[in-house]
From Swiss-Prot:
This is L-threonine 3-dehydrogenase. Homotetramer. InterPro entries: ADH-like_C (IPR013149), ADH-like_N (IPR013154), ADH_Zn_CS (IPR002328), GroES-like_sf (IPR011032), L-Threonine_3-DHase (IPR004627), NAD(P)-bd_dom_sf (IPR036291), PKS_ER (IPR020843), Zn_alcohol_dh (IPR050129). Belongs to the zinc-containing alcohol dehydrogenase family. The gene is tdh. GO terms for molecular function: L-threonine 3-dehydrogenase activity; zinc ion binding. The keyword Cytoplasm applies. It is found in: Cytoplasm. Catalyzes the NAD(+)-dependent oxidation of L-threonine to 2-amino-3-ketobutyrate. Keywords: Cytoplasm, Metal-binding, NAD, Oxidoreductase, Zinc. Its cofactor is Zn(2+). PROSITE patterns: ADH_ZINC (PS00059). Gene3D superfamilies: Medium-chain alcohol dehydrogenases, catalytic domain, NAD(P)-binding Rossmann-like Domain. It comes from Salmonella gallinarum (strain 287/91 / NCTC 13346). NAD(+) binds at residues 175, 195, 200, 262-264, 286-287.
């Protein structure tokens, strides 16, 4: 079958032919319809330090997708041929304390689809049936293909009560923009997002944020004054991994504020810990999606009127995958969809 693979320990990704995966007793075989390019896939393409330490070569990559069930393991119940599905890309062990306690997203033995095992940038994908999620009929293939990153956004945004709160989102990448849209949709008062990429800030404006702030040109404190905010932000969603953005967040949080961190900062990032301590801030690390509570919330948010369509900016045939990766690497895109039909 046709597949996009990391074939060499160097920059790039290559179309190749690989054997169709075999279906185990507890697995589903999924015929891929659409995939989306993740920032992780760009890291793998670029062959950065993280990729060199993490990705075995060769490896079929990709973990954002929607497809159709075409094969079912003999032990599987609850699915049938023809079901339209996406799936949780974190494969968990099922026997550690967190798995047995129902906190599977915190499994210490997690492996990643398209990272540690073959991914979805292929005509067919095999995953455990437990990881598959049926897509409701009123959710499009395009939206279903970005459920994985949308789940990161939902998990981060809904970590805290947002109704009536003032929310700061640092980082206007696709996940940050979706998190801001979720916050606004569920009842936050002011949702302010910051970045230095004007293209992506404009996407955030299309998604309905209160203010999208280019911090290279505009002061966040001035924006807060404009909005009549006198005490700081109640909730911070750190999506950028940029030390200056996190330091600004600490400066502008209200006392007792809560911060959810999805962005990955450098290991040597230095902050003023007195601000965390004396403001009584609560900081929560976010990894992946809660299985499967986040997935049910994703579907419900879309079904209740949350419009994610502006975040999808580019669509290509899989044969034009290079154009898709070029768009993602340029920084002048939202989500990029690759069609396998």
């Amino acid at each position: 079958m046709k597949a996009l693979s990391k074939l060499k320990a160097e920059e790039g990704i290559w179309m190749t032919d690989v054997p169709e995966p075999e279906v185990g007793h507890n697995d589903l075989l999924i015929k891929i319809r659409k995939t989306a390019i993740c920032g992780t896939d760009v890291h793998i393409y670029n062959w950065d330090d993280w990729s060199q330490k993490t990705i075995p070569v060769p490896m079929v990559v990709g973990h954002e997708y929607v497809g159709e069930v075409v094969g079912i393991g003999q032990e599987v119940k609850g699915f049938k041929i023809g079901d339209r599905v996406s799936g949780e890309g974190h494969i968990t062990c099922g026997h550690c304390r967190n798995c047995r306690g129902g906190r599977t997203h915190l499994c210490r033995n997690t492996t990643g689809v398209g990272v540690n095992r073959p991914g979805c940038f292929a005509e067919y994908l095999v995953i455990p049936a437990l990881n598959a999620f049926k897509i409701p009929d009123n959710i499009s293939d395009d939206l279903a293909s970005i459920f994985d990153p949308f789940g990161n956004a939902v998990h981060t945004a809904l970590s805290f009560d947002l109704v009536g709160e003032d929310v700061l989102v640092s980082g206007a990448g696709p996940i940050g923009v979706m998190a801001a849209a979720v916050a606004k949709h569920v009842g936050a008062r002011h949702v302010v997002i910051t970045d230095v990429n004007e293209y992506r800030l404009e996407l955030a404006r299309k998604m309905g944020v209160t203010r999208a702030v280019n911090v290279a040109k505009e002061s966040l404190n001035d924006v807060m004054a404009e909005l009549g905010m006198t005490e700081g932000f109640d909730v911070g969603l750190e999506m950028s991994g940029a030390p200056p953005a996190f330091c600004t967040m600490l400066d502008t949080m209200n006392h007792g504020g809560r911060i959810a961190m999805l962005g990955i900062p450098p290991s040597d990032m230095s902050i003023d810990w007195t601000k965390v301590i004396f403001k009584g801030l609560f900081i929560k690390g976010i990894y992946g999606r809660e299985m499967f509570e986040t997935w049910y919330k994703m579907a419900a948010l879309i079904q209740s009127g949350l419009d994610l369509s502006p975040i999808i900016t580019h669509r290509f045939s899989i044969d034009d995958f290079q154009k898709g990766f070029d768009a993602m690497r340029s920084g002048q895109s939202g989500k990029v969809i690759l069609s396998w039909d």
